[in-house]
């Protein structure tokens, strides 16, 4: 009684649960044999229990003691000519999960399964079953198969994950894979050709169209192998292939009759080319069997392998030999499956569809890779499950097919023959070479250093990989492996991270002690010594030192304390390493940031100056690059990008002192085509180096300690602004890069922007590259097909405005007269918004690249008067007053511009690049300068670069076109004709701008030569002890001498092999002669100028004159001053006696005929320090920056 009640309750509960979750309606063609089962004890992960039991044709429907099954038993059909319903799919997968030992579960994949066949595969560790030998549609990148992912819902809940893939040859042939996400143990795979068109001609035309669209061009034999399993029972495959070939020939595609070499059945020839270069590695989405070959080896493919295999079990493709497959009969299916399992080769391959989980190192170590060495056309998929069991059992045999099939041998992974170096320090950064069986390029190689450290590798030679050794946190021995396209292809090799040597540890400890001492001195200078009390130098770490600096910063901010400058600036005569140098050597980025934050409250402090130099002339960036401190290097470059162009005493930039491949951003900077040359940098800055006023902003430049007179400050700012504009390189910002506007994103991308190469006709062999900002601007306004963003238009209009203001008035008047003919058409008076200056005669001279620019622009604008919102009345004044009217008209239109875009000519900060050129001064000089061609070679080059009147008129007209375009672009949509005219005008302005930059270059070169010559004369005067001052000056040669020969600054003529760098090198050699170290020379010049600052009396018999050295104007002059007695000077100076003693130490400045005891020392009228006194070595005049 109890047993019957229990069985009845179980039936009702099971029925209610199945009906609640999904309504199971058995189809008419399904047969269910009901047997009495035990009550299930376990349920699946999604609380479902299978409603059927899957049995193979040879399995009797009996109860197994090791499994729990429902009450229904179903024979799993291997072939089904329609898609399964969602309920059927769920039942099949759950039944397979409940009984994984069932014979319905297949552990071997079949090559090119026939249409209507379905399989149940175990997932194992990857989607290995997807390598079935068919050619499927690819993604847009052409590398991976395209899969459509869907979630099938049952009763409103997504319980089935489906993946659909479509054939690239037969558009009606598909493969569908189903799995249950909550219980991802088995997968149901179904192949089906949903449309069977019996007309061969229509089917052939459809297949030919699909092959052309998917770019599948294979041989006729391979096409026959692809179509045979799909149209096994419906069409004559031989006739179908012939029809397809005819359709392809009509469309201009000829398929090869012989099989393409090195082409497996599961991929095209292009895929195999990429595939074979991996040696024994397999690429995602390609065949599971790796083709291992040497560079000189060629593998041929047997095109008839599949045909031979099909003939063995009766599938030869002919209509007379077709096999009639009957659905209830299972013996034929079993024989086909057994034969497929027999000929399948063992291998393991991950799926290339992107849905497989990554392979761990342990799994890769437990598997081996098979390769084909003989001539085989088909890389048949293999049984991953059987291979896994075989390899774990230690067996080395591979089940083979008939002797006529391919010969397959099992080999291990590619061994690493040698690697150098085999050990490294904890810092890493060295280049390592790995030698092995890696031959061809075009693949993504990576080398793993233990777990979680993958470094990209480059194939620099056949069999040689190169990568950078990553840093390590502790000394250890790690396993190194080579990966190709994400798959391990080599055996493991040991690599050792060695601990630091004793002397390196000692050096680091000494550096830490020095940093602590520096911070202690800083605390004393800021009267914040309480922050470092009870702290020992032996316990200093980066975090502790950073906290100390932050405490000092907080105390300075809260109390606003005065600090002692002498403790922070150190000695100017003996430059040493600053705290930034020491921190950069250890790569303490947190401490470096804390010091930079503190420097914002301490202006003009050498300890916090990123341009400060040590005794070798190295900046903190040099030190960071030498020690591979990448974090500090990125931080310094983000603060001020010009630090990468500073050179040390040996003329080396930070890029040149950095180890190879240690810092990527510096290597990229070094590999640029247009890079700063150390000699050119020194010449362009007149031997000066400048730091920044606001370190974190890095925008406003200033001289180091430039005080009055204002001329020196103006000259220094102008010189540095030229350098910052001309040589500002694209740095690699670490998370601080400035984003462009949405409209300008495409044209302002530093990765996609390239410099425009527009030929400029000029008589010079000097090329000054565009800065990145100007290159991006010109690229945005001159490239066809790119929408010009508003900010680029504003900047271009600003440049055009400055050019117009710099041009002489006579050029403007002549251009206005030429653009305003006397006899005008009365109908043209009503062209709204077109100024008189835009009219142009046909005889107006225009450049060859912009003919009739103004006429085209006027015609174009006249047709768009309806959209023009700028209506200006026609000028009725005479041609004599046209200049004033034009200025008024220009000022009227300038009111429309934004305040940020336009400013007065005297406001430099509001220009489109605040740190670029001094356009107001230099452009006017460029257009109006009068040079003598017979003075010297540099003057000749300046004369050649100067624009003549006709060229200046062309530039003026182009600038007016840009001005007009900017005023009206917001109110109308630009046309193609308008864009062409604006582009030609922008090219004209670009040529003018580039020639102007070359003009500035030669001008600075000339000024640098003058500076060197003047300094040489100063030194020559000090060495002369006899003769009057006039005689001394007269005796100084015009040019410095080297080895008894006069050195003259010369620039080669056109077509000469000597370039500008040799001229600058000549300047350096002349200046640095007889001085090994630059600091010593700078100190001597400073002492000389400091001593000559005091006035010296010279008695010429009548009056007394004073000779004063004016370092700013770089010239000597005589200044008459009233005679002052020594007693009066002593009364005004309480410390006169000490000053007289100090001046007696410089006998070379005592006039001839006077004695030290009788010479009266002049009094310094003011306490204002001369600007040269504040220049620290190597910032002296004429030093090499």
UniProtKB/Swiss-Prot annotation:
SMART domains noted in UniProt: CG-1, IQ
Domain notes for this protein: May negatively modulate calmodulin/cmd-1 expression via a negative feedback loop in which the IQ domains bind to calmodulin.
Alphabetical list of Gene3D superfamilies matching this protein: 1.20.5.190, Ankyrin repeat-containing domain, Immunoglobulins
Tissue expression as described in the entry: Expressed broadly in the nervous system.
InterPro entries xref list: Ankyrin_rpt-contain_sf, CG-1_dom, Ig-like_fold, Ig_E-set, IQ_motif_EF-hand-BS, P-loop_NTPase
Family as reported in the entry's similarity comment: Belongs to the CAMTA family.
Protein's job: Transcription factor. Positively modulates neuronal levels of the ubiquitous Ca2+ sensor calmodulin/cmd-1, probably by direct binding to the cmd-1 promoter, thereby regulating Ca2+ signaling, physiology, and behavior.
Name this protein carries in UniProt: Calmodulin-binding transcription activator homolog 1
GO molecular function, one term: double-stranded DNA binding
